[in-house]
Swiss-Prot record:
The Q motif is unique to and characteristic of the DEAD box family of RNA helicases and controls ATP binding and hydrolysis. It comes from the Eukaryota. It comes from Zea mays (Maize). Residues 688-719 have a biased composition (Low complexity). This is DEAD-box ATP-dependent RNA helicase 3B, chloroplastic.
Length: 743
């Protein structure tokens, strides 16, 4: 490969202090001569050094006879028969003694793959693009050659006050910046290393720079602040490192990074480390790096998940995610550790706060202080709380054992991130579970994720109330079994008395209270997942009713049977069974109870369901509601134009992002008129004229429908509107089926 070119070997061999490094370099050259590195192994100056190619160019591959390929005379520092470990030993690479000593004191005695791949081209002065995953030793990969150069260049400069930095390391987050600073300080305590980032005192960092510094590590935003304030001078920077460059893009630092690069000396050496190569990173390398060598230890292989991870995917609306999240954790984590991944810091805070009412949780993101971060991680590891809500950036590099459940609250940016997130569970051969939340507009992305990762999701519905109660009880029982016997003896008297009084109900009451269900749980819609709503299924036998069965038929049925139900009906979806005419829809719990007790027209069956049947999905590819995307407020405060309570024409407010897709075939236009196709979306406000056999419908701002002109009320709502639709028994207009003279 290009990293092992003869100029690199010449540089290494010309350094009288690099005895061990000369041996390693000469060994690589000899391996090439023996044919181990064929045509692609040593290539053009900007060729790619891959993991596979590097394995063929190991710095110390044993021969079968136990003797190295050069014999015993290759170098005085080389001993025949020594294997890879000895050749890659830190002590044998010609590094300064003080650097070797500090590394060995930290237990670092050998190079990792990324470190051995970077070492020679970095010492050669090449610009580099290195692809390596998080946690593979990238910091020392660029740290070792830079520290070596700084120490060997020292002419008393290191102790000079007011010196400007020779090394600049840019990191996307303060967590990573502090980690890099720690690595460099521990490896080279003699060098002046300063870490700068936002959220802390500007003056403290300014004073540290004014005293003189060799290495500056920081986030782009604070670096620019210090440059603009005249506190940071970059005119003598010799080495630039962009660590996790792809994450710079993810957190919005691309413009800041380019601003900084434009102010650096042209003759600097630049090293860019990135797990992925988005277009911005490629553009950056073309513009600001000089004929860079690419070292790729990731490759183009598909990301794969560890075996033993069960994958689920659940379709939700944006607003229903938080409602369903706690139930998913209760049912699938079974009291174990859960990590919920969000994209933004704001989401992490809000999700954690929403969970706190039912499940102990903490947030982890870049705005949290280092002290709080460590406190949070220790508490999670020790089981003081069971749910950690984290952003991708804040969670990079974390090592937390025994995580039972991963929830992707938002879709990851790429397959690698999905694998990285999900890989937090199912470690060391243990079983684990990962659940992906997605909206209807993200279905294609989910399919692409399955293809790219090579996995298959099991698509699930939100847990039912019964499943949540059962799982909660099991968790409480497991907790009770862990109570120390010495503690229970103080409560035996009260327990016996209560058991005599209530029998098994005493224990049941205790389980309910400890599970957080002192009051009966309210119903929840299977469609919108909102509490206080019930999902019903209407089935009509063949031969009953007129025309095609459609959501319009459902609204007509409800208008004739119960005007209050028609006035409050939510979204309507047709079932997918071709042999049965059916639909599902939402109603407020109290209205649904009354409707289920009413007499229905012949051939119609109405039931409360606990699981959605297969539904027709022939709606538009988008789930935008057009003009209705922003005009729906809280459902409890909504009012129809006719004055009655309404669910916003069957739509659901989803924060303007991913709106729950209508079951119909067309979107509403930006006017107040409705077409027949609009009716197929279902859930329209029922202060309108409609019935089973009706051929026309019009939107009315009048009051709620009445039965044959009679005044009726439900829940305090008055209905005094005359009926102008058509009877579904005889098809004639002007009366309802309940008033039909032919019934």
């Amino acid at each position: 490969m290009a990293s092992l070119t003869l100029p690199a070997l010449a540089l290494a061999l010309s350094n009288p202090g690099a005895v061990r490094l000369r041996a390693a370099a000469f060994r690589c050259w000899a391996l090439r001569r023996r044919g181990w590195a064929a045509a692609g192994a040593l290539a053009s100056p900007n060729s790619v050094l891959s993991e596979h190619a590097f394995k063929r160019l190991q710095l110390g591959s044993d021969d079968e006879d136990g003797e190295g390929p050069y014999g015993s005379d290759a170098d005085e520092g080389f001993e025949a028969g020594e294997g890879d470990n000895e050749e890659l030993a830190i002590a044998r690479l010609g590094l300064p003694d003080e650097l070797v000593a500090t590394l060995e004191k930290r237990g670092i005695t050998h190079l990792f793959p990324i470190q051995r791949a970077v070492l020679i081209p970095a010492l050669e002065g090449r610009d580099l693009i290195a692809r390596a995953k998080t946690g593979t030793g990238k910091t020392l990969a660029f740290g070792i050659p830079m520290i070596k150069q700084l120490i060997e260049q020292d002419d008393g400069r290191i102790t000079r006050r007011g010196r400007t930095p020779r090394v600049l390391v840019l990191a996307p987050t303060r967590e990573l910046a502090k980690q890099v600073e720690k690595e460099i300080k521990e490896s080279a305590p003699k060098l002046g290393t300063v870490c700068v980032y936002g959220g802390v005192s500007y003056n403290v960092q300014q004073n540290a720079l004014s005293r003189g510094v060799d290495v500056v590590v920081g986030t782009p935003g604070r670096i620019i602040d210090l440059i603009n304030g005249g506190s940071l001078q970059l005119g003598e920077v010799q080495y630039l490192v962009l660590d996790e460059a792809d994450q710079m893009l993810a957190v919005g630092f691309e413009e800041d990074v380019e601003t900084i690069l434009q102010q650096l000396p042209a003759g600097r050496q630049s090293m860019l480390f990135s797990a992925t190569m988005p277009s911005w990173v490629k553009k950056l390398s073309r513009r600001y790096l000089n004929n860079p060598l690419t070292i790729d230890l990731v490759g183009d292989q598909d990301e794969k998940l560890a075996e033993g991870i069960k994958l689920y995917a659940i379709p939700l609306t944006t607003t229903s995610k938080r409602t369903v999240l706690s139930d998913l954790i209760t049912v699938y984590a079974k009291g174990g550790k859960t990590i919920v991944f969000t994209r933004t810091k704001k989401d992490a805070d809000e999700v954690s706060l929403a969970l706190t009412n039912s499940i102990a949780s903490e947030a982890l993101h870049g705005d949290i202080s280092q002290h709080q971060r460590e406190r949070t991680l220790n508490g999670f590891r020790q089981g003081k709380f069971t749910v950690l809500v984290a952003t991708d950036v804040a969670a990079r590099g974390l090592d937390i054992p025994n995580v039972d459940l991963i929830i992707h609250y938002e879709l990851p940016n790429d397959p690698e991130t999905f694998v990285h997130r999900s890989g937090r569970t199912g470690r060391a051969g243990k079983a684990g579970t990962a659940i992906l939340m997605f909206t209807s507009s993200q279905k294609r992305t989910v399919k692409s994720l399955e293809r790219d990762v090579g996995c298959n999701f099991e698509f699930i519905s939100p847990p039912s109330i019964e499943e949540v109660l059962e799982s909660s009880a099991e968790h409480v029982i497991a907790t009770l079994r862990g109570v120390h016997p010495e503690s229970t003896k103080y409560f035996l008297g009260a327990a016996e008395k209560l058991t005599e009084e209530l029998g098994p109900h005493a224990l049941a009451s205790a389980l309910a209270h400890l599970s957080g269900f002192s009051q009966p749980p309210s119903s929840r819609s299977l469609i919108s997942h909102e509490q206080g709503w019930v999902t019903l299924q209407l089935t009509r036998e063949q031969g009953f009713g007129r025309g095609f069965f459609s959501p319009r038929s459902v609204t007509g049925f409800l208008s004739d049977v119960c005007s209050a139900a028609a006035d409050e009906v939510g979204k309507i979806y047709l079932t997918a069974d071709e042999n049965v005419q059916g639909a599902v829809f939402d109603l407020p719990e109290e209205i649904a109870k009354d409707l289920l007790t009413m007499e229905l027209p012949p051939g119609n069956t109405l039931t409360k369901i606990s699981k959605l049947p297969a539904l027709q999905d022939d709606g538009p590819a988008t789930d935008s509601y057009g003009r209705f995307s922003n005009d729906r407020g809280s459902r409890n405060n909504r009012r129809s134009r006719g004055g009655g309570a309404s669910r916003g024409r069957g739509g659901w407010d989803t924060d303007g992002e991913d709106r729950f897709r209508r079951g119909g075939r067309s979107l509403r236009s930006d006017n107040d008129s409705w077409s027949d196709d609009d009716w197929s979306g279902g859930g329209r406000k029922s202060n309108r004229s409609s019935s089973f056999g009706s051929r026309s419908s019009s939107y009315s701002s009048r009051g709620s429908p009445s039965f044959g002109g009679r005044s009726s009320s439900f829940g305090g709502r008055e209905s005094n509107r005359s009926f102008s639709g058509a009877c579904f028994n005889c098809g004639e207009s002007g009366h309802r089926a309940t008033d039909c003279p032919n019934k």
